[in-house]
Amino acid sequence: MEEVITIAQIVHRGTDILSLNNEEIEALVDEIYSTLKGSNDIKNIRLIDFLFTLKDFVNHVRAEQSKLPDLSMPMEAYIRQLLVDSDVVPIVSEKKKELRVRPSTRKEIFLINGTHLAVPAEAPIEIYGLKLRLKTFSPQCFMRMAEIGSFSPETLGYVASGANLTNFIRVFMKCVDQETWKKNGEGVVVTTKENIIQFTHQYIELYKFLRSGGHSWLINRLAEEMVHRKLDREDQGSHISNIVETEEIEPEENIKRVIFFLKELSTMYSVSPVFTSGYMPLLYDLYRAGYLEVLWNPVEQKFLQHAEQREKEQMILQQVDMKLMEVTTQARQYFKIMEEKIGRVQSDAIREILTMEGKVDDPNSILQEVIKACGKQEAELITTEYLNIKKQWELQEKNACAHLKLVKQLRSGLQYAESLKVLESIRVLYKEKNNTTNWNLCKACGFKLLCPHVDMLIQLQAAEASYDTMRTKLMKFSGINKEKENNQGLIYSYFCKICGEELAHFIQEDRTADVGVIGDLNSKLRIFIWQETMKACTFIHFGKLVDVKQFANIAVNVCLPLVYSIENIKKEEDYDPLTQLYAVIYIYAYILNLIYSSQKNKEFLTITIHGMKADSSLNAYVTFLLEKMMQQYSGIINQLSEITDQWIANNFREAFKKIIHQNGLQGLSVQDDTKVLLTEILLDPMYDYAATVARIDGSIPMHKPRTPKEAEYEFKTVIGRTPAELLSQKEFYDKIYTSKYRPDFTQLARLKDIYFQEESLRVWWGGRDEEKTSTLIYLRAYELFLKYLQNAPNFNSELAEFKTYENAYGEQKALLAQQGFYNIFDPNTGRADQRTRLFEYKRLPISTLYDERGLPHKWTIYVYKAVDSSQKPTEIEVTRKDVIKKIDNHYALADLRCSVCHVLQHEVGQLNIKKVQTALKASLEFNTFYAFYESRCPKGGLHDFQDKKCVKCGLFTYIIYDHLSQPELVHDYYNNYKDQYDKEKMSIRSIQIKKDMTMPSTETQPKPPQEPWTFDYGKIIKTAKILDISPAVIEAIGAMEGRSYADIREGQGAPPPPTSMDDPRLMAVDSAVRIFLYNYNCLRHVSTFNKPPMHVERLVKHLSYEEKEDLEKVLPNVVNEYHTTFKHLRVTDPASALLYSIEFLCISFLTLYDIKEPSWVVNIVREFALTELNTIIQSEKLLSKPGAFNFMIFGEDFVCSGEDSSMDDISAYSSPGLFGEDIIDRLDDPFSIEDVDISLDVLDNLAPQ
């Protein structure tokens, strides 16, 4: 019987493994490997990787562990001291000649700002056997350490062969002045243009070869004298590996050359303008490919043995991966065949077994479970079908038919005409003609050639058909019921039932169906109809739950074409009141048709009006809708003087007739209440928020639910109840669900620590892992949310601080808005979403706005291009009114023409800009002049118009607003009264200046208070002690703006006492006192409020009405003579007025805080006093100087390990929504619900059992 070695047994055998030598360790690994290599069990095969890791780890632990040096002196000084004996050549100790292997976890080097190399703090750097732990060091420091010692393998990695790097160094030396090398072995920067060009060429060659992955190819290109040896491997074929270098190089010389190469490369990165951060990947690839190991292990014989052993291990691991992939594919196909041939009952049962707790996700176990669940005949059926599929794959892989190249050209063509030509060549190879139900097969090879829907799609695209036409014709290939999609509105994509390719998106249903017919000119009216339909839903009563947003979408599709078909709608693209009124009439006519249809056809969903019976007469509904319309839209109706009630009633009747004639009886099908409610819950942001955090910390699986059991488990974890329990209360639909998922703070802290450990500075470009960074901010926000749920009062201060940092960070992000890309964490997908954010001003000539007469363009004429029956290109120009009548799907919108100057939009750049500027200036001057004399007459008084002409000055009424129809009259009148206009204008300006310079009257001296006031600092100290804050914070009320909060706590940087009665600090403190007194009076007189303020109502909601009336009697009056004293001190002694207000605030607080009776009032008044004063202080604190964005708000471990706190990594914390285009993204889009992809499988799985 085959022996099975488990991980537990290996770990147990490894407890004393440190006492073994290298030969004994290798013997143990060979023994275990020989036991496993003949096994086909996936679990045993996976242990091979563990064995190699174990071997590496043991050797690493056995390595020499030296003590750390005394690093009391600076690192730079320590390295300089080590450089004193410059003639010393590093000697590799005998102990280092032993075989050393890599640890299982690699440490990587990376770049910060192109100037510093850095390593994780855990990675030691070895100098003369001493291991130093550094965070960052400069390239110069890097070179010095390279000169006096060697880097440990944990830091810089390994090479495939010491000779490989030697070859590259030898080629590199040809680019360097040999005399310079001999004179100065320390190395000189390559600065000549010729040498830089030569070096760059070799550099790029090395970079390409490393990226190709073929080390043998690299060696052949860089060193042609290489000798190779063929290594025979058992069950692995052969592999070429370089062994010997024809040029004998001593280890010490090898180290010198490597050090010189690294020194040149590092220095060039620092000082040479030729090299940029784009060259850094070479160091990373050198590290990954292992070309730096020669620094620490120049003993070639031992090193080559290790390289050969490691190559063997890699080949074995590759075979393991291939075996694992093969078995995984086989398991998936078994499962698919089982579902198709036998049914889903057994497959669902196997899924439940495989997803049980404790089960290992092993493809081999899936195969065993599938075979076990089937009978003998069923097992043979599945096995035979899999072999047939596998054979089909092999045949397809070997297929070299000519149709493969044609299909590739067809799907990658850039122009429809080219694709149409390729399609004609493909059609010749069809095995059957006019096939629309299955794949078109190739008559040459018999394999699948092209799906029929692709054939039709290419034809439609070449004919420039509209999206609506393409969608309609391709719908016959869809596997989704069209009616179901229209009625329920829950399906957002269409897929081909033959090949499974996506056909269309629902998001394009309403917004792009008409592109090419009327463009996007009707977007405003479309949104208006959608919004008004949503408002109408407030008085409509539906018999069942209805998706009102989808209902509004249907209303837009019905009403919009009818509104555009009206003859007397203005030709201009004006969003005028008449157009709005017509839209409202058709919306209400559509609602009336739904009500009428539901009465005639009982299969339709019952629709009525709130407060009216379903069987009410049609006249009753008409009366209600007309009254509602005239009441709701009286503002629009009043703008139209010619509109009467009878006009509205007549047009309402005609609109109802049109809808009946065009659509017949219309009804809404009865929707499934369960799916509607569950859709609302699954789209709720709070559900998505809690579910995302639950996935992150492992409370629910990361993948979407695959079975009803998984879906119910996720739903219950997040909501706290099963769907069946929740739906039993759906009659109380208003927010019956709240998220019950509450991970405690310990769990969140543990979760964040895991992410902090993984959050290391990245190799590429020296940036953070932005996806994980965004996730941490997400967790921090959720932690604040939990604190709010548990203790709302104590939450306010932390939230205010969080918002302060958040706002400061938003300002910094705005300054960095020129950066091309931001990574934003998307909680729906769990990964970063890359979006372009470029903020640039586009400069346009003024002729794009105005013509040469200074008039604004009106682009109301649409130019369409088409092809007539004679195949001659034609153009047609129409207005908006004629678009529906004259334009069909064969026309495409080509350009716009101005109805004022008749220039095409693409020709505005050809207008004379100087003429435009001159005319615009004159037009503005005329507009100002005639607006000035619109009512007043230059001859005095007002105009006296008779027969449209002023009898005093001769002004015609029609030239006041129209300056182009009679230019001679306009200029004559302007020239006659230009001087008079200038005089009157200057006269008005002088009067205005005199008025503005009038000094205010002197304020009377306020009366002094009855009792003199003296300052008592003890009140402030006592108040600060109760609030547990510094007294300096209370003293700084009104004076925190622009100061650091740390300085405020210490009492530093306080401004001098006020010397003026208008000092803003006096107004700020006085406002704080008045707010405190106002809220306190609201509390005292709460019984007089019909609806008291929210913060007061929260305090007294448990009191009876009698107790609320008694508050006025039991609570003291704390106002006293505050206003009199403050007014007097503000004028006579502003500094004392500031202290008096602060002291009065503390006295009022202490008076309320120290109330002892009656007992039922004590807690109310004390909580009020604490809340009010804390709110005042926190509000003042928000005005303090925020400074740079402080990432400590998200936790200490969130900050990068290291001293660097520059702004270069700030884009890693980007969170859109505050500036620039992000504001546009947040505009309320009534069609936004269509962008959300709702998985119907999830809704089906959540159905109550």
UniProtKB/Swiss-Prot annotation:
One of its GO terms (biological process) is symbiont-mediated suppression of host cytoplasmic pattern recognition receptor signaling pathway via inhibition of IRF3 activity. This is Minor capsid protein M1249L. Coiled coil: none annotated. It comes from the Viruses. Interacts with the minor capsid protein p17 and with the hexon capsid protein p72 capsomers; these interactions form a rigid zipper structure that stabilizes the capsomers. Interacts with host IRF3. It is found in: Virion; Host cytoplasm. It comes from African swine fever virus (isolate Warthog/Namibia/Wart80/1980) (ASFV). Belongs to the asfivirus M1249L family. Induction: Expressed in the late phase of the viral replicative cycle. The keyword Transferase does not apply. Together with the penton and the other minor capsid proteins (p17, p49), forms a complicated network immediately below the outer capsid shell, stabilizing the whole capsid. In addition, blocks IFN-beta transactivation mediated by the cGAS-STING pathway and regulates the transcriptional activity of IFN-beta. Mechanistically, suppresses the phosphorylation of host key adapter protein TBK1 and degrades host IRF3 in the cytoplasm. GO terms for cellular component: host cell cytoplasm; virion component. Its main location: virion. The keyword Transport does not apply. Keywords: Host cytoplasm, Host-virus interaction, Inhibition of host innate immune response by virus, Inhibition of host IRF3 by virus, Inhibition of host RLR pathway by virus, Late protein, Viral immunoevasion, Virion.
